[in-house]
From Swiss-Prot:
Catalyzes the condensation of pantoate with beta-alanine in an ATP-dependent reaction via a pantoyl-adenylate intermediate. The lineage of its organism: Bacteria, Pseudomonadati, Pseudomonadota, Betaproteobacteria, Burkholderiales. The gene is panC. This is Pantothenate synthetase. Beta-alanine binds at residue 57. It comes from Ralstonia pickettii (strain 12J). (R)-pantoate binds at residues 57, 150.
Length: 283
């Protein structure tokens, strides 16, 4: 596996490769990331991964400086997965001058849910993903469903810009107790780690309530999610949101949508101690 930091060297290395499968990451790799590499191999060849902690998507009070950086361990893991190239640029490589041009998602998708609680986050995500796509020029790119809103935004961005890249979704990888694997799980104390799977169990309860009451016209989805947030608060969580949305565009479902059987998803973000966790479950 070649480890490359220069954009020009990356382009030279990939010249003539027209089925590149790409997996962008911020490093501190776990089994969830490695499953993306395996899925990428099913859709293209060679597999290219990137590791870049993107300052543009971190807010002023977020964990950019503390975000775990484990490059040597990550390199060893990617080598075992047979990754062809790891693109690991420095900030100077990616942003040799201030990044004045940005890619901003539409308000209805970029400023709700995560976008409401992390202003500017998706502008940073879209900008770096677009730049990585320009550097790698993949035919396929794999994004995990754990970051459901990010997946939807990147997919729409690729469509609206007519980018020649297929966005492939990957199922969330979970620990045996249901907790979604995340690089930020390392921040959890032992007690918090024992409590953390309750977030996924709460999503299952919301799904059950939607199926048994909302779809039967006996309750609104807002009543169901309010109950879920109250439940989490009672267990010591600080939920930002629990929300039922349409899978197609992450907008709130209307009664007509629900009656017509519109596919739905429930999404959540909540703090446990100092650690903010996100998760989702399709209904």
């Amino acid at each position: 596996m070649k480890v490359i930091s220069s954009i020009q060297e990356l382009r030279d290395q990939l010249r003539g490769q027209n089925r590149v499968a790409f997996v962008p990451t911020m490093g501190n790799l776990h089994e969830g990331h490695l499953s993306l590499m395996r899925l990428a191999r099913q859709h293209g060849d060679p597999v290219v991964a990137s590791i870049f902690v993107n300052r543009l998507q971190f807010g002023p009070n977020e964990d950019f400086d503390k975000y775990p950086r484990t490059l040597q361990d990550d390199i060893e893991k990617l080598q075992k997965e047979g990754v062809y190239v790891l693109f690991a640029p420095t900030e100077r490589d990616m942003y040799p001058e201030p990044q004045e041009y940005r890619v901003e998602p539409p308000h209805d998708l970029g400023d709700t849910l995560e976008g409401e609680f992390r202003p500017g986050f998706f502008k940073g995500v879209c900008t770096v993903v677009m730049k990585l796509f320009c550097c790698v020029q993949p035919r396929v790119a794999v994004f995990g469903k754990k970051d459901y809103q990010q997946l939807m935004i990147v997919r729409r961005m690729a469509h609206q810009f007519a980018l020649p890249v297929d966005i492939v979704p990957a199922e969330t990888v979970r620990a045996d107790d249901g907790l979604a694997l995340s690089s930020r799980n390392v921040y959890l104390t032992n007690e918090e780690r024992a409590e953390a799977p309750e977030l996924y169990r709460t999503l299952h309860q919301v799904r059950q309530d939607v199926l048994e009451t909302v779809l039967q016209g006996q309750a609104s989805h807002e009543e169901v999610t309010t109950k879920a947030m109250d439940y989490l608060r009672g267990r010591g969580w600080q939920p930002d949101y629990v929300a039922v949305r349409r899978r197609s565009d992450l907008q709130k479902p209307t009664p007509e949508n629900i009656a017509a059987g519109e596919p739905l998803v429930v999404l959540t973000a909540a703090k446990l101690g100092k650690t903010r966790l996100i998760d989702n479950l399709e209904i």
